[in-house]
């Protein structure tokens, strides 16, 4: 938010389900960062997102997004485990890529430092799917 204030522009940050988001009018740009589009695992839902974005964009507006590819999920992350121990906490990140469905599941266990000095353990399962570049363009 500090960067927004420094920019001098009125930037509206929203957190909504991208399959159902609503705006108060049209905008010049929509930005979806950090591979958010990979959370959309169904082609119909991705089409819904694209239609919503198109609906809220100015005629010359731009939609900026990034997506991880099948190559990244299969070859780089694959069925691997990544673990790190940092000053503020630790994590264990287990990946499982299903070749048949194209679904990648992150089993993420976080150990976060509490003010008491104890560590708090949380666990999240994150499901993501790469979308074929040609399919995405055709939608």
Predicted regions and their residues:
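Conserved SAM-binding loop
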Residues: 1-4
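Conserved SAM-binding strand-loop segment of SAM-dependent methyltransferases
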Residues: 6-23
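Generic enzyme active-site microenvironment
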Residues: 15, 33, 64
């Amino acid at each position: 938010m500090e960067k927004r204030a420094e920019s001098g522009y009125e930037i509206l940050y929203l957190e909504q389900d991208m399959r159902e988001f609503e705006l108060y009018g049209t905008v010049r740009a929509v930005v979806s960062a950090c591979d958010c589009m990979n959370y959309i695992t169904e082609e119909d839902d991705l089409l819904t997102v694209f239609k919503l974005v198109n609906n809220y964009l100015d005629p010359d507006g731009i939609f900026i997004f990034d997506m991880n590819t099948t190559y990244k999920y299969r070859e780089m992350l694959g069925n691997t485990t990544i673990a790190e121990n940092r000053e503020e906490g630790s994590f264990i990140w287990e990946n499982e890529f299903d070749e048949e469905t194209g679904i990648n599941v992150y089993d993420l266990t976080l150990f976060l430092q509490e003010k008491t000095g104890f560590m708090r353990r949380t666990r999240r399962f994150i499901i993501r799917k790469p979308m074929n570049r040609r399919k995405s363009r055709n939608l």
